[in-house]
Regions:
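Functional-site microenvironments in short loops/helix caps that host divalent-cation chemistry
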Residues: 24-28, 49-50, 56, 61, ...
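Short, low-complexity, disordered segments immediately C-terminal to signal peptides
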Residues: 25-37
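A short glycine-rich, aromatic-capped structural motif
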Residues: 40-117, 121-124, 132-255, 260-274, ...
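Short, structured beta-strand segments at or near domain termini in extracellular proteins/domains
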Residues: 432-448
């Protein structure tokens, strides 16, 4: 009898607790779902919402050459956010600096631990791991330390500013760590040593969902780890053009503030993907610090998304602004490209222009034609339009190193600027005329689309 009464009390307590969590038990035994706070997806900074829709992808039969690898096909894409502009030098430098600083802080913390230095003692100890004192660890950190080893519980002291002035290095240990980040003395130029950018490596993991969904195995079998050198290849300005003087662009384009708002180039498809991973990591770290929901991953657009966005709501347009001409009624060019043979400057730009130049298209996207070509997350296959899906179509083949680029660039003729023109480059190649922009999936449908749906069902 006592045991039965005890079980009843336990069950009653469970239902009371559950009812309290549901807001006072007002569900009256009905199926009302699990409670939660209301949520609305915020618009990411610098992005614009592209509503879902259908469009005719590819080239018309009138263009025999282009239709060989891009025959017309009606497809549908979901809603997503897209960067209004190409990723700029300034934005990519934020990524490079984050990687550089993280590597230095990790090496400083390791050196502090090796030499027995702790925070509060000055010198390199100020950069020691925050959990050096195990007595200050919380229960979860102690569990990680005891179960998986020290590295799982490690936290860097990011509040302490790094010291760049050699005259202010706090001690010899700090000097040793910083010295290893620079090129050796024999590679100094005019007596000035610079950082060895080949050491700026970003490590991340990703889950191959495509293979995981179609093959048997453990989750760990589909987790991939990548280590990517993130610094752009500035030599592209020289290598891409023979018998041409472009050294000023090689010397200044990426790092100088004069080009901060210009699109980053010299970035491979592999590096562009790494940037997307970092952007997601960086944003979600902030979200977690505020106790907010994490956001969807930033990524490269698939080819169908890119063309849909480039059209700007004009299904039959030749260019993002419609067309069929590349200049307006005042004879001003609508994009940065090569108008005539050997003529790069008639549009008032010899190379690239600022990322927010010319008029945006109907979706408020700048330079979807010209300036720099853009990486997509699609493998290039001239026959892919024949077999790909009609819903969010995409072909991504790990064995195919050719990746689709779109939009044309400052060194291309008008044909390459057309919204349906396809081109490709190898994923590990960097060029002076290829950049990228990112997208983020939109969860649900937009308020405008909800209103349309409601009107449609009345």
């Amino acid at each position: 009898m006592f045991m039965a009464r005890r079980i009843f009390v336990v069950l009653l307590s469970f239902f009371v607790m559950t009812a309290c969590r549901r807001g006072g038990g007002d569900n009256k035994g009905e199926l009302v779902g699990v409670g939660g706070k209301s949520w609305k997806q915020p618009t990411p900074y610098g992005m614009t919402l592209i509503p879902s829709g259908s469009f005719i992808m590819g080239s018309s039969d009138d263009d025999k050459t282009a239709s060989l690898n891009a025959p017309v096909k009606t497809v549908s894409v979901g809603s997503f956010y897209m960067d209004e502009t190409e990723i700029t030098n300034s934005e990519y430098r934020q990524f490079v600096n984050w990687v550089r600083d993280s590597i230095i802080r990790t090496q400083l913390a390791d050196m502090a631990e090796q030499t027995g230095q702790t925070s509060g003692g000055g010198g390199i100890g100020d950069f020691a791991y925050l959990d050096t004192n195990t007595e200050k660890m919380n229960a979860y950190q102690q569990y990680l330390q005891n179960t998986y080893g020290a590295q799982k519980a490690r936290k860097l002291n990011k509040k302490k500013a790094l010291i760049w002035d050699t005259n202010k290095y706090p001690d010899e240990y700090y000097s040793e760590v910083m010295d290893k980040m620079y090129l050796p003395e024999e590679e100094a130029y005019n007596g000035k040593r610079i950082m060895d950018v080949q050491k700026f490596e970003f490590k991340y993991q990703w889950l191959d969902m495509e293979k995981a969904a179609r093959a048997r195995g453990k989750r760990k079998d589909f987790i991939k780890e990548e280590i990517v050198k993130v610094y752009p290849d500035t030599t592209v300005w020289i290598r891409d053009f023979n018998y041409s003087y472009n050294e000023p662009m090689h010397n200044d384009y990426f790092w100088h503030e004069a080009y901060g708002d210009y699109p980053v180039v010299g970035v491979s498809w592999i590096q562009a993907k790494a940037f997307c991973e970092w952007r997601t990591l960086n944003k979600n770290a902030y979200q977690k610090s505020k106790g907010d929901y994490t956001v969807n991953a930033f990524r490269l657009p698939i080819e169908s998304e890119w063309e849909y966005a480039a059209r700007g709501g004009l299904p039959g347009g030749t260019y993002p602004w419609g067309g069929p001409y590349t200049y307006d009624d005042k004879a001003c060019f609508m994009a940065n490209f090569k108008p005539l043979r050997g003529d790069y400057a008639s549009d008032n730009a010899l190379y690239t222009v600022e990322a927010k130049s010319y008029e945006p298209n109907g979706y408020n996207l700048y330079n979807m034609a010209g300036n720099v070509s853009e990486w997509t997350n699609t493998s290039y296959d001239p026959n892919s339009y024949e077999y790909m899906s009609t819903m969010n179509p995409n072909v991504l083949d790990d064995n195919n190193r050719r990746k689709v680029i779109r939009g044309g660039s400052w060194k291309d003729v008008a044909f390459m600027l057309q919204v349906n023109t396809r081109d490709y480059e190898y994923q590990d190649s960097a060029r002076s005329y290829i950049g990228f922009r990112t997208v983020q999936d939109f969860m649900g449908i937009s308020e405008k689309q909800q209103a349309k749906s409601a009107r449609g069902y009345r």
